Amino acid sequence: FCKVRAEEKITEEMIQDPTLLGYFVDNELPWRKDALVRYLSLDKSDINFQKTLEWTAEEKGLDVESINMDTLKAGLTDEDQSKFLKHIADKYFGIVSKLLKERDPNHLFLGSRLHGQAIRLKPVFEVLGDYADVISINYYHRWTPRISELENWRMWSGDKPFVISEWYVKGEDSGYTNTDGAGGVVKTQVDRGRFYQNFTLGLLESKSCIGWFWHTYRDTKDLPKGSNKGFLSVRYKPF
């Protein structure tokens, strides 16, 4: 599937494009600390349950046929959860990075735009450190970047560079409802500018941050509904 997808999406023109930076392979995949418990709670007919049970049995030296599921799940440790998360992340990123580079060796593999709980999961960063050229992070719910988080990303990934692949804040004075999206809301466009300056100066504190992408070029939808996510209005006018 991944090989066919890469061949369909990545054209010869893209492969030879000197202005193309690289590729995100997905967006905000639901990496979870408790992935092992979640997989073991699936229906027994689900292939994901079956493969997870096989992995768990092998890790713990158990016979699949004699496992009591309630006892097994109750006895899972944080180490078990972490090892499984690293296992599935390695399986996924190992496959997609290999096929991506086979299809286009000229450009960067930029990860999968981590978001939410994923930005606090050490095993995912450890795996991305092995496969990604740059780690992408959709960084929200922060008025100022947390230096401790930026440093964790650097250490966990083995000094792999990261890029903030999505972030923004909306202004109340735009006239939009601003009810959708993860970005915060401030009073005015001047405040948006102050937020931008403060946030980017914070990112520059990290030697591993190589840049950032504001979420959208222009706002989404039209008045009165919509969100002030862009640099320009929906009519392509600067604020």
Q: What is each of the regions a protein language model found here?
A:
Residues 19-107, 111-123:
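Polysaccharide-binding and catalytic clefts of secreted carbohydrate-active enzymes
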Residues 33-38, 147-148, 174-176, 224-225:
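Short, solvent-exposed loop/turn and secondary-structure capping segments
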Residues 2-6, 91-94, 189-198:
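Well-ordered, non-membrane alpha-helical segments in soluble/globular domains
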